[in-house]
């Protein structure tokens, strides 16, 4: 199971997307409300946004006022899921998300436990993606109902670890296990490409890997290399 999380400033656009109200969503009929927390009864995107903004206005302004979360379990684990099963999956994930204390290499606390449990959020099931792989989208208010901020330091790690813990508890294949299983094949493919090249060329190397089905992410160093 894979999870992503990020604090964003364009919360209303994200809400329109996850609720299926965005014009970019071609099949809103394949998007389902899973659950809302501390919100009015079944609000639309603007209703969710206004409710979150009300909470923020009562405490302090914050730029990135919404946490965007995506949760993607393997389809084989959720093929017989109903809405209540998806609700339980989200609640288990949120519990693991909240309880973590993230420390730096020096042992100092970088991020205290979050409080999604007492924060406004809305969770939706999307089944309209390529291959119709079901996955969850959530939008969470950065401030809980007591005015405390949900820290976003290393929030992507918080999400990944929460997903790993839930997957392990359920006996599911984890992202780490998939990565470890794929490493030998990736190494073999890379070496085969290198051995077949008459001379070194980054572009040729990259394009050959892409033709093999890999996605190559390029990063420049401080020298632009």
Question: Residue ranges of each PLM-predicted region?
Answer:
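N-terminal nicking endonuclease/strand-transfer module with a His-rich metal-binding environment
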Residues: 1-225
């Amino acid at each position: 199971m894979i999870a992503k999380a990020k604090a964003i400033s364009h919360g209303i656009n994200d809400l329109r997307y996850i609720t299926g109200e965005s014009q970019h969503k071609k099949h809103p009929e394949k998007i389902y409300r899973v659950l809302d927390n501390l919100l009015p009864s079944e609000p639309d995107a603007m209703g969710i946004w206004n409710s979150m903004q009300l909470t923020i206005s009562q405490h302090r302004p914050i730029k990135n006022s919404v946490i965007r979360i995506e949760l993607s379990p393997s389809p084989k684990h959720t093929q017989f899921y109903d809405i209540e099963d998806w609700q339980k999956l989200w609640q288990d994930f949120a519990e693991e998300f909240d309880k973590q204390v993230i420390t730096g290499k020096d042992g100092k606390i970088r991020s205290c436990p979050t409080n999604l449990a007492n924060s406004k959020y809305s969770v939706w099931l999307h089944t309209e993606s390529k291959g119709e792989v079901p996955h969850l989208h959530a939008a969470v208010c950065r401030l809980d109902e007591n005015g405390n901020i949900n820290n976003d330091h290393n929030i992507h790690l918080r999400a990944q670890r929460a997903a790993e813990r839930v997957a392990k508890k359920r006996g599911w294949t984890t992202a780490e296990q998939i990565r470890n299983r794929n490493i030998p094949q990736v190494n073999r493919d890379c070496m085969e490409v290198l051995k077949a090249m008459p001379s070194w060329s980054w572009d040729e190397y990259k394009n050959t890997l892409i033709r093999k089905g890999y996605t190559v992410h390029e990063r420049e160093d401080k020298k632009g290399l």
